[in-house]
Amino acid sequence: ENGDLIAAVGSTQDFTGFNRALDAKRQVGSLLKPIIYLNAIESGRYTWATPIEDTAVNIPIDGDKSWTPKNYSGGEHGVVPMQQALANSYNLSTVRLANEFGLSTFSNKLKQFGVTSDIPAYPSIYLGAVNMSPMEVLSIYGNFATGGFKYPPRTIRTVVDAKGRLLERYGLNVQQTIDPAAAYILNYGLQQVMRSGTGRSAYSSLPQSLNLAGKSGTTNDTRDSWFAGYSGNHVAVVWLGLDDNKITGLTGSSGALPVWTNVMKQLRQEPVNLRQTDNVQWQWIDSA
């Protein structure tokens, strides 16, 4: 609603000087996939019903080297609707889609959304091979939750003296980053992640009437477990991992999502209800 930061928890002890929520930077896995689908939506050439290929892909990189990503399951899913690819976090179809728009388009979006970390110029960033703090991830998802506006996280509203006199006021610094129509369509896709995809277990504890939106993230060998999502009035990000980068065995859905769900249960939630713009239309699609 306003970018105000309610809490940032990431220290094992008080006053250690290192808060993982702010300072720890880890690979984010599939959390960045929504940006790829946003680029597709903004191009005007794709809808959530557009069929895309979830088949093997090989991308040349330096010299005679190449990058060959795999799905988490190791298999392929053939031709699938774009919505299914995001909801189930398919890697192959996502990389194929991302490659159509290029690295610079992807990197520029990250910077536009508030990422300040270094962004490698390699296609593996499409699947989250870039180090970010949970706070940076929060900044990205804040753009989605507000319908396309960037509210930098704010920890102080005002400063007053001992007598209550105002010394300084910190107002909102709002920037539009996504066209409202594209933001509305992306939001629908992220809601399907929660209804039928990798985030669906959240509804075992939270009412479906909240229309939650979010995305899980898992890095190679399950070293990092992430979940980022939002209701109508709260955005929350959870990371689980070990400081020595050892394997946790947790995916985003099995580790971070239950923690995220428990946090959201403790807060008063409002449903996600972004306004449908006049230039967005719904059509029935024959699945056959």
Regions found by a protein language model. Name each.
Residues 18-26, 68-73, 81, 92-98, ...:
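Second-shell loop/turn segments in exported
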Residues 35-42, 47-54, 278-286:
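Cysteine/selenocysteine-centered motifs that mediate thiol-based redox chemistry or coordinate metal-sulfur cofactors
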Residues 2, 46-106, 150, 161-192:
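Conserved catalytic neighborhood of penicillin-recognizing serine enzymes
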Residues 50, 55, 123-125, 154-157, ...:
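Extracytoplasmic/periplasmic beta-strand context in beta-sandwich domains
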Residues 39, 43-44, 48, 59, ...:
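A generic secondary-structure signal for well-formed alpha-helical elements
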Residues 1-32, 43-50, 104-110, 122, ...:
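Periplasmic/cell-envelope proteins involved in peptidoglycan metabolism and beta-lactam response
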Residues 64-71, 102-141, 148, 152-155:
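Mid-domain, small-residue-enriched loop/turn segments at the edges of structured enzyme/sensor domains
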Residues 1, 5-8, 13-20, 32, ...:
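A penicillin-recognizing enzyme superfamily signal
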